[in-house]
Structure formats: structure tokens, C-alpha cells
From Swiss-Prot:
The keyword ATP-binding applies. Its main location: cytoplasm. GO terms for molecular function: 5-diphosphoinositol pentakisphosphate 1-kinase activity; ATP binding; inositol hexakisphosphate 1-kinase activity; inositol hexakisphosphate 5-kinase activity; inositol hexakisphosphate kinase activity; inositol-1,3,4,5,6-pentakisphosphate kinase activity. Substrate binds at residues 26-27, 188-189, 223, 237, 301-304. The lineage of its organism: Eukaryota, Metazoa, Ecdysozoa, Nematoda, Chromadorea. It is found in: Cytoplasm, Cytosol. It comes from Caenorhabditis elegans. GO terms for cellular component: cytoplasm; cytosol. Residues 993-1006, 1090-1101 have a biased composition (Low complexity). ATP binds at residues 109, 162, 169, 188, 212-215, 221-223, 284, 296-298. This is Inositol hexakisphosphate and diphosphoinositol-pentakisphosphate kinase. Residues 933-947, 977-992 have a biased composition (Polar residues).
Length: 1323
């Protein structure tokens, strides 16, 4: 025993184990290898030693001359002689860490997949194409536009094409035409690129490839590094196929973050290590659809930058080597040897608390948003009845007789239709030529008459086929997302001829071509900008050293949250191209991606239609059709709206609809006026096209002929004669006309350059009609709104409810969630933070129905003051424009065990809403300016007489005559701003009370200062939306004008002629006694005098190389205005009743025509809301630019609280907001938007930011989660409520006064005569 005790204190190992590193020099001396070997020596130095095989010896010397070692670490890489290493192992028989013979398996992707399959490891479905390989027969590949066939197996796009050899990293991903086609080409990283997008969609024709089914993994790749069967370290990175940009750290290494592996994935790692015989082995995981797929096995690889991984690996390998030799030599295992690690993946820490936008202290857990798509082109379609046998052959080719219709969107299908259209155009031209020959040669009157009729028919058909050809040839290529052809089978039928004879017609095809409705460039930029701004909803950056850091003004906190896999993001979109493209552009801005949208769309955006998530309900659509018929008749009455009409058409008393009805007065006369404007537009396009060079096109390459046909179709379908020969108007076409006029004024303003007065009036008239028609198509009475909304939104509500439940359950068993491993992370201050985000992009119908559920679903108590303010605010919203957002934010206060009455709920929800873009038209901008000019020192609130300019016009009055009569009085109205005073005439026609000082007005007009006070007549809960608008609207950014001159110059403000009452936008002052206040007319528009017009230099630039002299002047005057603020508040207002000729004021009436002509020259720019990133707030003595996304004005009652606004200039640094957002946020914790310096954008870029987005208004900030869950449950259960009978026709198109008085009310005619059977039985 004594001998043994003495021996235990002595060295029990006779010699050290030698580890030999046999690999190419760049691998053997890499940073990870050196770090790991150093750790092994540190931990096990008394038992092991190591050396590196010289590269020259490996390459040039025979294996007999290679140095000896006990343990060999060897692996294949480029130029490594694997066969010599295998021969060395056979010769010397060392202990091998990674099996060298099995490394050949890793070089062939076919073998890799076979081994995975044999071991039951999930992997993508795949097929092989072999070409030109010895001893292997070539396989067959058949390529189609949107799929391929490999040995009889079909792979639909998107699919992945990889070379058979694992050494070849040129991997291609092919996309379907439905998302734009093309391919993403991946390669070994070169500088900061790992892939690029190519428009080519054809697969490679040379070489051998493996084709895999594409697995969308939300733009994330997971790399797993296994060390032995019981240890695996996982890191995630941005997928190289997403945008191709490589994110690198300060050391030049690709940025990756450790993530948690599920138990199943750990088992996969164990299986791979054992199946491939590789102790150190890396492989790639794709997580999708609740599963994890192995798409590649890389063999020997180390983590690049993890110190903890180096230590763990050193202990595992060192322990394994020592124990192997101790066992093989019967040596004693050292008792003091370091033990291998067991990685703890527990999540024990509490998540960090943050301050919510409303001021509460809680942790953000979940964000759910429903967002409407961005700005689009007008949707269009044309119909043709065809009997040509070639179309029947096409119909049969695509199995049309099975369903009696076909839909064609694929490029090859559209090309077939295009070829037929081209052939038919040529044939019709030939037929026309022959008819003209007959006409010239004809002698008899009957023969000439017949030839003339045939010629007319032939030319009409030729025009239709030319239009179809033109539409199909637009853009020069087919993408599959912007055009669609349908063909429906029409059976044989009998028709009556003109002489009452029955004639049997054979079968025919109804050919329907649909185009338009695609996202515009502006819509793309709006979505991307909103994505960038959306980052600021999330927690900001927190420093790891505990020191304070600057406020996160660019959403960097979100980017870090997402890139470090503490953010679970899913984006869903309905199947319309504009919706999916909006979602992709939003994701691009949200995640700071680069490059084309197609790869982003394919990898980040999920189709919501696969499970009917955003589908429409069939019965709801039928019911809406009946509502359209009701509205069609109700808005045909040739009389002013009566009080009864207000009750029937607007039973909920929405301010926006009431204001629109007051504007319209007589709906039939308004329809006549609108029809006259549409007809005028048709003539304007013809005139415009005659003054332009041949081949000139409008926005997005729309030809003049297509634009003319677009408006002619609107006129033809809107104004038509019924079977009695009476003119009637199709009210259902009002939304289409509104889309068209809004689109042309936004994107084709040159069309209106000499007719701005008429088309301003047209826009306002059509908008007010649309403000009635569009929301009422989703229900008129509350019960109708609710039933339709439940039918449409139930699938979405179920999904949202499921999102909330899964977020709160926080199951660790979610296999597909890529989540940061907090135990292995470094340099992250809040590793336990985790946020779940679900974004749903959809069209207008889901927005309207969802908002109806929120309004009328009894979410909150009627006594809730916050909810009252929110409903008052929503009552004034006239439209849910492009990019409308409904956002739910779930917060948790982890300090509370459960919902307690005294401490409040553990989980609460904040509801935010934005109506999207500002209305794009000038009138809305003028209204903003008008309100800015009403100062706090004015003792009377601005009013407007409803009798002024509001009388119904005669049906026969033309648009021009109705405006000309008002011109002289308005042309005298001129507002002139000087550096010292603002002269404001008394405006009887507009009833505007305007007075100010120059500096304060300059600030106010740009949204920098708000000085409107609350009078004793105002209601406490008045919600004047205008007060929330802080918008810098710049005129003439194209080096033509500047809105503020230099200090010694005069900048003039002139009221432009609109000749029309303006529309009611939300909160346009009709609160309290609002029935007595009319809808104010179009007001001010910035223009300039001749001095400014002639100036054409860089001082007019708002941004760019000229450093923005305009901006500097504006900000200088703003600062002076603020400095003089206290003096201005006590001074009486300066009101000059009429313009007086002087050096600083007055515009003579004789100059009116010259000014009007001058304004017309610059008219295209006046129609755009040019917004600059001028975000003002005082930081010390200078100007600090900042911006905000969230407003709490509605929530706090500050929205319209003029007493609070009075001193707003004192709180100037609190953060006024411009660009995309509008409302002054009350809470200092509200997240701020991106900060832009003036040189960040060029003038051209700024001009494309219009119209701006409205801020997210906080509707409620303290809804208990259980309360909201109960609300959703009620709505989902009530979705099977049968639809009530639609309202019957309330009024004929024309009735006598007596008949009108006897007409029953809607309540009387809307008796339920039957119930539609529910689609399914209740539970």
C-alpha cells in the first residue's frame, strides 16, 4: 500500500501523447485552430503535446517521411491530398479524430443525402441531373417556365440548384414568375458579397447538379458545430440568398450569433457525428413548418469567434484523447483532469423592463400589425367575346372545359395570348383594307351601307385587339404579377335580332384581361420607409457596460434585437402582387436589407392564402353586392339630403360621412358634375397627347391611348342610360373614379397643368362621394357592419388570437424558433429579451372590416374616457388610405404574479392606429396651412359659413362656369410674409381669420410651432386632427422656388384659386356645434414672387450639394420666432382687412392672370406633398433633428386641447415630428424615428417621399389581455351568425316631393324577410 501511495504521487504516464495537425497551412494555423490547441495544452499540457505537419512535407514528401504522432487531426480542404493522409493512417495507425475514409462521402452531395436518408434525418426533397460523368448514364431534365421535371419528378419554382460536388459553391435559387422570376446566385464570399440577383430564370445546361425543393426559413441560416455526439454549438446568420450582403464584425469575420438548439436538433447532431464518423463536424440547418432540415454537411469546421466554444472544444477533445490512450495502454486516467462541459441552455433570468410609449414600465412581448398595401396603379380590365377557334384550342390546352374557365398568369401563357392578339391585329388590318376597297368600288346604296357598317365593326374590333396587344406588351417582359387573362366558356344561346327574329348563336369564350393594381415606385418607397420607421416601436439599445448611451434614433436597437435572434418575425401577405411586394419592401426597410425584392419576398413573406387567412367570405361578398345596389339607388335622388337621409345613410353619426353628405347636398347633381369632370379629363388627355411627341408615355410607361381608354371606360360605365332611356349613374364606380383621379394627380400632374381649378374640384367632389360609398359597402347599420366584418375577418382573428396565446405560453419546445443562446452570447446586455412579431399585409377590405370590429365590437366600456376619445378620433377619419396600420403591442410586467385589481394586469395591450398616407391632394395641404395661421392670440375660433359657396348648383352648370364666378373675389386674397410681419386680408369668401407675425408664422406653417389656443366654447374632448399635423410641405423643390427668402427679401404667400369647397378631413373643426360650421374651402398655397421665380441656384435646394440654403433660412427664422415668442404672445394680432400696395405687401388685381399663368407652369410640383426631413427640437443652443412614430395625443385628450397647445413652444424640445409622422408625442419615452441630416438625401429622392405617412395614434394603452382575448373569442364564435336581409331600395331615382315625404324610412324597409343559412353548423 505504501508503494502504491508513493507511486500515485509520481508521474504515472511514461510519456506525453503527441497530437499531429495534418492539414493545409491556412487551416492548421487559423485562429480557431490555434486557439483550441492552445487551450488543449493549457488544460492537458502535462499529458499531451502537439505539432503541425509542414505543408511542403504533406504535398511533396511520401507518407513514410511524414513525422510520427500518437493522435492525428486531419481533414480535407482544397488541394489537400486526402489519399496520402489515408495512406499515412494505414501505415502508422494513429488515433484519428475524424475518419478520413468517410470524408470522401462529404465531397459528393448525393452521398450526403443518402446517408441522411438512411439515418432518418430530415432533408429537402431532391433529384439529380448527371451529365458527362464516366460510368454514369446521363439523366433527363425537362424545363418549363415555372417548374422542371427531373427523372419524372416535378420541382416547382422556387427550387435550389447545387453542383454535385461539395467543393463547388456556386448555388442558384430560381424564383417563379409570380414573384418576378429570375434567380439568386450564391458563391463563396467575395469582400462583402455572398450572392447577387440575376433576371435569368433558365437552369444551367452543362454539368451535374442536384435539385432541391426550396425551404423558406425566414431569411436565416443555422450552422451547427458538433464536437462529439454530446455537444453541439449553433450559430445563426442572415441567409446569403436574402440580399447577398455579408455583415462583418470589426475583425472582418461574418457576424453570427449563438442560438438555442431544440432537443430534436441535438439528436440530429448526434446522428450526424456517428453516421459520418466525424468527431468535429459542421452542418447547416433550415427551420421551417415546424421541422428542422439538414441541407448540407460540411465536415471538419470550427466556430470563428467564440471563446467559450474554444474552451468547450479543447476540453472535449483533450478529454477524449487522454481517455482513449489511457484505455488502450492501460494507463490510469488522471483524477485531476478537466472534465468536458455540459452546456446549460436554461432561461432563468427575468427579461429587462422598458418604458412603454404611454409611460408604463413593462417588457414588450409581442407586436401584431395589420397593414394595407402601398400606393398602386388603378385596377383595369377589358372584356371580349371571342369565337376564334385558336382561342378554343388554347382553352382546351389548359383544361378549360373541366371548370368552364381558365386563368393565365404565367409568362408563357400570356405570351401565347399576345401572339394571338398580334395575329388578330394583322388580320383585322387586312380585313379593314379589303372593306375599304369594297367601299371605294361599291355602287349600290345598300352595298355601301353594309360596307360602312362592316368597317365600323372591324375598326372597333381592331382597336380592342390593339389595346390587348399594347397591354400585354407593356414593360417589355412578363413577370406574372401585374397582368392576368381569364377565359370563361359561354354556352350556345338564342338572341333576338333587330327585326325580332330569333337567332341561335354558337358557343363563345368571354376573354377578360386584367392589369394594373400594381405597386408604384412611390408605394414601394412608402413601404420601405414605414419598415424603417417601424423599428422604433421596439426597445432601444442598452450598453453592456452600464453607461448611458444616446437615444436610439434609427431603430438600431431593433436591428440588434433581430440580428441577435431575440426576435421571432413572421410576415404574411395575401396573394395579390401589390400586397406581397409591399410586404417585401417593408421587410427590406425593417431589416435594413439591400438588393432586389424578389429574394426577400420569397424568403421572408409567407402566403396567407394557403390556409384562407386573408380570403374573403363568399356570402359576405354577395351581401356587399346588395348593399352596393342599395347605395346605388339611395344616391340617385335629385334633391338635397334630408335629416332622414342622414339617419338612414349614416346611422352611427360618423363625422366624416356627415361632412361628406353636407358637402354633396344633392347627390344626383354631384354625380352630374363628376361625370362632366370625367368627360373633361377624356378631352384633356386627347389634347395633351396631340402636343406631345409620338410615343410619349405617362407614369409607368402607360401610353396615351391606354390612359384615354381608361377614362373613357370610367365615363361609359359611370354615366349610362337605363332601359327607359333615362340617364343614371353607377355609384359603385365612384371608388374607381377616385382611384383614377388620385393616381393621375399624384403621378401624372402634367395632364392637369392648365386645368388645375377644375381638377382640384373634381378630386374634392369624388373624394366626398367615396367617403360615403366606400365605408358603407361594408355595412350601414351596426349589426350589418359586425356580421360582414366577422365573416371576412374570422380566420385572421383566429390567427391573431393564436399569436397572443403562443407568445404568452412561451413554449421552449417550439422547434422552428431561432433564438439566442444567452449562456453563450457575448457583448449583449439583454440576452433574455425576446419579442414575437407577426405582420399581416392585406387589402382595403380587411382593414375596413377589422376597424368595424374594433369600433362596434364592445371592446371597451362606453364609459371609458380614453375609448371615447379614440372613437371620436376614428369618427373623423375619412378614408383608410394606402399603408393604413392597425397595431397591437403586448406588454408584460413580470413583477406581477397575475392580474390583480390593486396593481393592474400582468399583461396589457396597447392599440395603435394610423390611417396611412395623407390624402395626396393640394386641398388637404392647404387646410393644414390654414389652421396653422389661426394663432393663439385670436380671440375667436376660425369659422366658416355654410351658406357661402355651399348651395347646390344647377345640373346644367359646367365645372368651369361654377368656378369662374368665384374667381375674382378669391384672386384678391393674397397673404404676404415678410421677416417682420404677416399681412393677412379679411377673407369673406373663406371666412378665415388669419393673423400672425412673420417668424412665428414661418414656424407654424412648417409644423414647427403650434400656437392655437383653446377657447371657452370648445368641448374638453374636442379632437381636432389638424392640431396633430406637423408636416413640412415644400413647394417647387426642382430649383424653381423657395418658400422663404433670404433675410432681406420678401417671400409671398398666395391663396390659389380652387373654386371649390374643400373636403372634410378628420377633425376639421366640426365638433360641438359642428352642424353650424361649414366645410372650409381650399385655402392657402405657397407661391412666390417674380424675384424668387427667376432665382435658379443651389440655395433653393432643401438638401444635397448646396447644403440647403432654404433650410438654413427657414431654421434661422424659426429660431428668431422662438426667441421672440414671449413678446409675440402679448402683442395684439396684426390684421389688415384688404391688401394695400406697398413694398412688402399687396398684389394688384392686374397681376392675377400673370400669377395664375406662372403657377400653372409649376403646377405638377404643387400637387405633390414634398416632405423634407426637417425635424426640429432644441438641443442646447442649436437645432437638433429628431422624429417620432407614436402619438399619444388622442389617448391623453391632448388632441385638440388648445390650452395645452398654448405653451407648446416652451416644450419645443419635446419633439415635433415631420416626414411620415405627424403628431406631437406627449411621452418622453415615445420612440423616435430615424434622424436625417440635410445632406443625406438628394432633391430627387425627397420629391419621391410624398405623400407622407400619418403617425400611429395610440387609441388605448391599458386594455387587459384577458379582456382582449374575450373580445376575440366573442367575435370568432359569432362569425356563424346568419347574414340579415340587405336593405331594400329606399328611393327611386326621381320622385315628387309628395312621394318623397311618403317614402318609408330605411328602418321600415329593412325588415328581415329571411335568414341566409350559415355556411357551417355551430359548435
Amino acid at each position: 500500500m505504501a508503494h502504491k501511495g508513493t507511486e500515485s504521487k509520481e508521474q504515472i504516464w511514461p510519456y506525453k501523447i503527441t497530437i499531429g495537425i495534418c492539414a493545409m497551412n491556412r487551416k492548421a494555423t487559423s485562429k480557431p485552430m490555434r486557439a483550441i490547441m492552445k487551450k488543449i495544452i493549457d488544460f492537458y499540457g502535462q499529458w499531451v503535446d502537439s505539432f503541425i505537419f509542414p505543408e511542403q512535407v504533406i504535398i511533396n514528401e511520401p507518407v513514410e517521411n511524414w513525422p510520427l504522432c500518437h493522435c492525428l487531426v486531419s481533414f480535407h480542404s482544397t488541394e489537400f491530398p486526402l489519399e496520402k493522409a489515408i495512406a499515412y493512417v494505414k501505415l502508422r495507425n494513429p488515433y484519428v479524430i475524424n475518419n478520413l475514409d468517410r470524408q470522401y462521402d462529404l465531397l459528393d452531395r448525393r452521398t450526403v443525402f443518402k446517408i441522411l436518408s438512411d439515418n432518418g434525418i430530415e432533408h429537402p426533397r431532391h433529384g439529380y441531373v448527371i451529365r458527362g460523368r464516366p460510368n454514369e448514364p446521363d439523366t433527363e431534365l425537362v424545363e418549363h417556365p415555372d417548374h422542371i421535371e427531373v427523372n419524372g419528378e416535378v420541382f416547382n419554382k422556387p427550387f435550389v440548384e447545387k453542383p454535385i460536388s461539395s467543393e463547388d459553391h456556386n448555388v442558384y435559387i430560381y424564383y417563379p414568375s409570380s414573384v418576378g422570376g429570375g434567380s439568386q446566385r450564391l458563391f463563396r464570399k467575395i469582400n462583402n458579397r455572398s450572392s447577387w440577383y440575376s433576371p435569368k430564370s433558365e437552369v444551367r445546361k452543362e454539368g451535374s447538379y442536384i435539385y432541391e425543393e426550396f425551404i423558406p426559413a425566414d431569411g436565416t441560416d443555422v450552422k451547427v458545430y458538433a464536437v462529439g455526439p454530446f455537444y453541439a454549438h449553433a450559430e445563426a446568420r442572415k441567409a446569403p440568398g436574402l440580399d447577398g450582403k455579408v455583415e462583418r464584425d470589426s475583425d472582418g469575420k461574418e457576424v453570427r450569433y449563438p442560438v438555442i438548439l431544440s432537443n430534436k436538433e441535438k439528436q440530429i447532431a448526434k446522428k450526424i457525428v456517428l453516421a459520418f464518423g466525424q468527431t468535429v463536424c459542421g452542418f447547416d440547418l433550415l427551420r421551417a413548418n415546424g421541422k428542422s432540415y439538414v441541407c448540407d454537411v460540411n465536415g471538419f469546421s470550427f466556430v470563428k469567434t467564440s471563446t467559450k466554444y474554444y474552451e468547450d472544444t479543447a476540453k472535449i477533445l483533450g478529454n477524449q484523447i487522454v481517455r482513449h490512450y489511457a484505455k488502450s495502454k492501460n494507463w490510469r486516467v488522471p483524477s485531476d483532469m478537466p472534465q468536458p462541459p455540459i452546456l446549460d441552455l436554461g432561461l432563468g433570468d427575468d427579461p429587462p423592463m422598458i418604458t412603454t410609449p404611454s409611460g408604463k414600465l413593462a417588457e414588450l412581448r409581442c407586436v401584431v400589425a395589420v397593414i394595407r398595401h402601398g400606393d398602386r396603379t388603378p385596377k383595369q380590365k377589358m372584356k371580349l367575346i371571342v369565337t376564334d377557334q385558336r382561342f378554343f384550342a388554347l382553352f382546351e390546352k389548359y383544361d378549360g372545359y373541366k371548370k368552364h374557365e381558365i386563368k393565365m398568369k404565367k409568362p408563357n401563357q400570356l405570351m401565347e395570348v399576345l401572339e394571338l392578339a398580334r395575329a388578330l391585329v394583322i388580320e383585322k388590318q387586312r380585313d379593314r383594307h379589303q372593306i375599304l376597297e369594297k367601299l371605294r368600288e361599291g355602287t349600290g346604296e345598300e352595298e355601301i351601307h353594309k360596307s360602312e357598317h362592316d368597317l365600323e365593326v372591324c375598326e372597333e374590333e381592331m382597336k380592342k385587339w390593339e389595346q390587348m396587344r399594347t397591354v400585354l406588351e407593356m414593360y417589355g417582359h412578363f413577370s406574372g404579377i401585374n397582368r392576368k387573362v381569364q377565359m370563361k366558356y359561354l354556352k350556345e344561346r338564342e338572341t333576338k335580332t333587330s327585326d325580332e327574329e330569333l337567332r341561335r348563336e354558337g358557343p363563345a369564350l368571354l376573354l377578360i384581361l386584367k392589369w394594373g393594381g400594381e405597386l408604384t415606385t412611390a408605394g414601394n418607397m412608402q413601404a420601405e420607409a414605414l419598415g424603417r420607421l417601424f423599428r422604433t416601436l421596439y426597445p432601444g439599445i442598452r450598453r453592456t457596460d452600464g453607461k448611458s448611451s444616446p437615444e436610439d434614433t434609427q431603430g438600431l436597437g431593433f436591428l440588434r434585437l433581430h440580428s441577435t435572434y431575440r426576435h421571432d418575425l413572421k410576415i404574411y401577405a395575401s396573394d395579390e402582387g401589390r400586397v406581397q411586394t409591399t410586404a417585401a419592401a417593408f421587410a427590406k426597410g425593417l431589416l435594413a436589407l439591400e438588393g432586389e425584392l424578389t429574394p426577400i419576398l420569397m424568403q421572408m413573406v409567407k402566403s396567407a392564402n394557403t390556409d384562407g387567412l386573408l380570403d374573403d367570405d363568399c356570402q359576405a361578398r354577395l351581401y356587399q353586392t346588395e348593399l352596393k345596389r342599395y347605395l346605388h339607388k339611395a344616391l340617385q335622388a335629385d334633391r338635397d339630403f334630408t335629416p332622414q337621409d342622414y339617419l338612414e345613410l349614416n346611422p352611427n353619426g360618423l363625422r366624416a360621412i356627415t361632412a361628406a353628405m353636407e358637402f354633396i347636398k344633392n347627390p344626383r347633381k354631384m354625380c352630374h358634375e363628376i361625370a362632366g369632370y370625367v368627360e373633361k379629363m377624356c378631352g384633356v388627355i386627347v389634347e395633351y397627347s396631340q402636343t406631345r411627341p409620338t410615343g410619349s408615355t405617362l407614369y409607368l410607361q402607360e401610353s396615351m391611348d391606354l390612359a384615354q381608354r381608361r377614362w373613357n371606360k370610367e365615363l361609359r360605365e359611370f354615366r349610362r342610360k337605363n332601359k327607359h332611356g333615362e340617364v343614371e349613374f353607377d355609384i359603385s364606380k365612384i371608388p374607381d373614379i377616385y382611384d383614377n383621379i388620385k393616381y393621375d394627380m399624384e403621378h401624372n400632374p402634367d395632364l392637369c397643368i392648365n386645368n388645375e381649378v377644375e381638377f382640384e374640384r373634381m378630386y374634392v367632389c369624388v373624394k366626398n362621394m367615396a367617403d360615403i360609398v366606400v365605408p358603407q359597402e361594408y355595412g350601414i347599420k351596426t349589426e350589418n357592419k359586425m356580421v360582414i366584418a366577422q365573416r371576412v375577418c374570422t380566420p385572421l382573428l383566429r390567427k391573431i388570437r393564436n399569436d397572443l396565446h403562443r407568445c404568452l405560453e412561451n413554449k421552449e419546445s417550439e422547434e422552428t424558433q431561432t433564438r439566442l443562446d444567452p449562456r453563450a452570447s457575448q457583448g449583449i446586455a439583454t440576452p433574455f429579451r425576446h419579442v414575437r412579431t407577426r405582420l399581416y399585409f392585406t387589402s382595403e377590405s380587411h382593414i375596413h372590416t377589422l376597424m368595424n370590429l374594433i369600433r362596434y365590437g364592445n371592446l371597451c366600456s362606453v364609459d371609458d374616457k380614453k375609448w371615447q376619445r379614440a372613437m371620436n378620433f376614428l369618427s373623423g377619419v375619412t378614408e383608410f388610405n394606402y399603408m393604413t396600420q392597425v397595431v397591437l403591442m403586448v406588454y408584460e410586467d413580470s413583477r406581477k404574479e397575475n392580474d390583480e385589481a390593486d396593481t393592474g394586469p400582468r399583461f396589457h395591450i396597447e392599440i395603435l392606429f394610423s390611417p396611412g398616407l395623407y390624402p395626396c391632394f393640394l386641398t388637404e395641404k392647404e387646410r393644414i396651412y390654414e389652421t396653422r395661421f389661426n394663432l393663439s392670440t385670436n380671440p375667436k375660433p376660425a369659422t366658416s359659413s355654410r351658406s357661402s359657396g355651399r348651395e347646390s348648383r344647377d345640373t346644367n352648370d359646367s365645372a368651369s362656369s361654377s368656378t369662374e364666378g368665384r374667381r375674382p373675389s378669391i384672386e384678391k386674397v393674397v397673404t404676404v410674409v415678410t421677416p417682420t410681419q404677416l399681412s393677412t386680408p379679411s377673407v369673406t369668401n373663406d371666412d378665415l381669420s388669419i393673423s400672425s407675425n412673420a417668424e412665428s408664422t414661418a414656424a407654424e406653417s412648417t409644423g414647427l410651432v403650434n400656437t392655437t389656443t383653446k377657447t371657452h366654447n370648445d368641448s374638453e374632448d374636442d379632437l381636432n386632427d389638424v392640431e396633430s399635423v406637423n408636416l413640412v410641405a415644400l413647394d417647387e423643390l426642382n430649383n424653381t422656388t423657395k418658400a422663404m427668402a433670404d433675410d432681406g427679401k420678401t417671400a409671398k404667400r398666395q391663396r390659389s384659386v380652387t373654386g371649390a369647397e374643400k373636403s372634410m378631413e378628420e377633425g376639421d373643426k366640426p365638433h360641438g356645434e359642428w352642424k353650424g360650421n361649414g366645410v372650409a374651402k381650399s385655402g392657402s398655397q405657397i407661391s412666390v414672387g417674380s424675384n424668387e421665380m427667376e432665382s435658379n441656384n443651389e440655395s433653393m435646394e432643401t438638401v444635397g450639394g448646396g447644403k440647403g440654403q432654404w433650410v438654413k433660412d427657414l431654421l434661422d427664422q424659426t429660431k428668431r420666432a422662438m426667441a421672440m415668442n414671449s413678446i409675440r404672445e402679448v402683442e395684439p394680432p396684426i390684421v389688415i382687412p384688404t391688401p394695400v400696395p406697398s413694398t412688402t405687401t399687396a398684389v394688384v388685381e392686374d397681376e392675377a392672370s400673370e400669377r395664375q399663368s406662372r403657377s400653372r407652369r409649376y403646377f405638377p410640383y404643387r400637387f405633390k406633398h414634398h416632405t423634407a426631413q426637417l425635424l426640429t427640437g432644441m438641443s442646447g443652443g442649436g437645432v437638433h433633428m429628431q422624429n417620432r412614430l407614436i402619438s399619444t395625443d388622442v389617448l391623453t385628450g391632448k388632441f385638440g386641447d388648445h390650452d395645452n397647445k398654448k405653451n407648446s413652444r416652451k416644450d419645443f424640445g419635446a419633439g415635433t415630428a415631420v416626414l411620415s409622422t405627424a403628431v406631437i408625442a406627449r411621452s418622453s419615452s415615445a420612440p423616435r424615428l430615424m434622424t436625417y441630416e440635410s445632406e443625406d438625401f438628394s432633391v430627387g429622392e425627397i420629391k419621391r417621399f410624398w405623400p407622407p405617412l400619418r403617425s400611429l395614434e395610440t387609441l388605448h394603452d391599458s386594455i387587459n389581455l384577458s379582456q382582449f382575448d374575450g373580445f376575440l373569442e366573442r367575435l370568432i364564435k359569432g362569425a356563424l351568425t346568419p347574414l340579415p336581409s340587405p336593405p331594400k331600395t329606399p328611393l327611386p331615382s326621381a320622385l315628387s316631393c309628395d312621394a318623397i315625404n311618403k317614402t318609408p324610412t330605411q328602418d321600415e324597409v329593412e325588415k328581415v324577410i329571411g335568414k341566409l343559412a350559415p355556411t357551417s353548423s355551430t359548435d
